[in-house]
Amino acid sequence: MIISAASDYRAAAQRILPPFLFHYMDGGAYSEYTLRRNVEDLSEVALRQRILKNMSDLSLETTLFNEKLSMPVALAPVGLCGMYARRGEVQAAKAADAHGIPFTLSTVSVCPIEEVAPAIKRPMWFQLYVLRDRGFMRNALERAKAAGCSTLVFTVDMPTPGARYRDAHSGMSGPNAAMRRYLQAVTHPQWAWDVGLNGRPHDLGNISAYLGKPTGLEDYIGWLGNNFDPSISWKDLEWIRDFWDGPMVIKGILDPEDARDAVRFGADGIVVSNHGGRQLDGVLSSARALPAIADAVKGDIAILADSGIRNGLDVVRMIALGADTVLLGRAFLYALATAGQAGVANLLNLIEKEMKVAMTLTGAKSISEITQDSLVQGLGKELPTALAPMAKGNAA
């Protein structure tokens, strides 16, 4: 099979993975309207083509939280990576490290902090959920600090799990889920051998000690479901800000006022995100939400964005809309499921090449030159409706 884009990795992953795993990563909440709009809205953002700009000295390098990045991309925190490839978090982290970008380890990773951190040279980032068990949160932060994690990504858009219809149909949840998952596994031999048999243990490595002796996926899902905390407020985050002395990023911002609150709180960064369309269906896509947020807080706080990014052109679009850096989620997971570390490495190379093409043809020699001026201005048909008002200048 020829691989030339993330969409090719998606097709390959669908063949390799048991359906419950493929649809868990590929699906979204409710009718998946926001999931679709994340991709579609971003694809409608039109860029200005510029010519004869002498682009021979183009550079993708940038700096974030005093870290040098080879391009403005980091791998997002994605749960259960170790179920998509053998010790998947380690493989993805190695690919990111080799490319000179950060890897973010999820709270609900298969591989624990202590397994992933020593496998790479670059300090990784760590993602933490808001949980009722503050003792677990404090312990996780202590482990992250001990492992040398440089940045904390604090996910705040999950006070309760989203309603994901696909999971019930695919076997991730619902009646007879364990038997359905088993039958799917044995009919997907490549995955069964590489991950099912040789990728053990399949614990959630950062959590397993808190569950005693879990017997299956339902034990982890049950523990998490009972520990998400809907009572959380900005005040509850103060002890984390006091405890964590490195950069702290608030993930799950879609409203300018929440972005301003993050600045007042003292966060170092925010992630404009709707959790990949997996939480509340019907909310704005990240591409639609980003311009107003950038208008409110650009320059006061680092702005990251995720949800809907599938290629290097999308990265350039997000930066033009106001992001400083983007996070890749599903795109790298498709590649990981298809070819492990090599797949993620190849995807990152593709994204870098695509970014260079987009920057060359828009006349942006550096990341700082990708701005609102890079967008086609004043043409509502080319921009999603919610983005058109932020465009300034002449049509090109």
Swiss-Prot record:
GO cellular component, one term: plasma membrane
Species name: Escherichia coli O139:H28 (strain E24377A / ETEC)
Cofactor: FMN
Family: Belongs to the FMN-dependent alpha-hydroxy acid dehydrogenase family.
Subcellular location: Cell inner membrane
Catalysed reaction, written as an equation: (S)-lactate + A = pyruvate + AH2
Record: residues binding substrate: 24, 129, 164, 278
Biological process terms in GO annotation: aerobic respiration; lactate metabolic process
Domain of life: Bacteria
GO MF terms held by the record: FMN binding; L-lactate dehydrogenase activity
Biological function: Catalyzes the conversion of L-lactate to pyruvate. Is coupled to the respiratory chain.
Entry annotation: catalytic residues: 275
Source species taxonomy: Bacteria, Pseudomonadati, Pseudomonadota, Gammaproteobacteria, Enterobacterales
Predominant location: membrane
Topology versus the membrane: Peripheral membrane protein
UniProt protein name: L-lactate dehydrogenase
Residue positions binding FMN: 106, 127, 155, 251, 306-330
Pfam families: FMN_dh
Keyword match Magnesium: no
Protein's gene: lldD
